[in-house]
């Protein structure tokens, strides 16, 4: 009878630990930890459940509750306070826009599996088209990503063409193909710039990506005018809701690690 009771207690602790571990993984995903792995198809829920279940039957199980409490508190602080806008400020670079530059560069921000631009990509493109309409540059460079899903190569090429056609821009648009990182965008555009004699670029990207992106383009030899795009639901404004602030925190977390990575590789100063 005692053995059965002990086994029941162990099973209960294991199940509780697995549940708490899974919830920790879910909350960590909301905070943006998952995207740091750069493997969107890799879910951490099962490993977290296994680790939580294993810890749940040991004397270390209080650590699960401590971790859960810290993550929960962090979620609440980020969602309901202006912490993220304060953290984001050092990552944002906004230069004065001159009367003329050699080209406008709109950087990519990913696309969906059904080959449509993500909202952030669309916002960047619209901001770039607005600058082109003002006559800031004689040409608009637009990054175009290409990825493999289920063994098939896909891109948001058709969606990009549809939106630019709707804009009816009189400025020539040049698509820069097969970019994967900010670094490859800068290198590919630099190759094109050498042939065309472009030296000064207005780089249009998301606010929190702006400082790293513009530093990357400067590192390959461009003179850069940094232009943060106008983003919907950016989470950086005083009236932002909890969902937007959490989304902004994910961007901040990613950019913080990405900036450190670029510095260590010598791609930016």
List each language-model region with its residue ranges.
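Short glycine-centered helix-capping/turn motifs at secondary-structure transition points
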Residues: 35, 132-135, 266
């Amino acid at each position: 009878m005692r053995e059965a009771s002990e086994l029941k207690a162990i099973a209960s602790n294991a199940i509780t630990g697995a549940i708490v571990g899974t919830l920790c993984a879910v909350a960590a995903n909301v905070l943006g930890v998952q995207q740091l792995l750069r493997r969107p198809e890799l879910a951490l829920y099962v490993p977290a459940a296994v680790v939580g279940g294993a810890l749940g039957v040991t004397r270390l199980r209080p650590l699960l509750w401590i971790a859960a409490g810290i993550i929960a508190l962090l979620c609440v602080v980020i969602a309901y306070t202006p912490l993220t806008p304060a953290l984001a400020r050092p990552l944002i670079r906004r230069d004065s826009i001159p009367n003329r530059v050699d080209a406008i560069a709109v950087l990519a921000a990913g696309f969906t599996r059904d080959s449509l631009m993500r909202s952030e990509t669309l916002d960047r493109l619209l901001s770039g088209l607005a600058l082109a309409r003002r006559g800031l540059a004689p040409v608009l460079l637009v990054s175009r990503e290409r990825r493999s899903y289920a063994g098939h190569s896909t891109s948001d090429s058709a969606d990009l063409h549809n939106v630019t056609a709707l804009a009816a821009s009189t400025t020539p648009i040049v698509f820069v193909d097969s970019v994967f990182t900010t670094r490859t965008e800068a290198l590919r555009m630099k190759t094109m710039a050498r042939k065309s004699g472009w030296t000064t670029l207005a780089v249009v990207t998301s606010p929190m990506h702006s400082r790293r992106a513009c530093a990357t383009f400067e590192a390959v030899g461009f003179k850069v005018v940094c232009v943060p795009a106008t983003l919907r639901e950016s989470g950086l404004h005083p009236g932002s809701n909890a969902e937007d602030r959490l989304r902004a925190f994910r961007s901040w977390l990613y950019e913080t690690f990405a900036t450190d990575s670029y510095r260590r590789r010598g791609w930016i100063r």
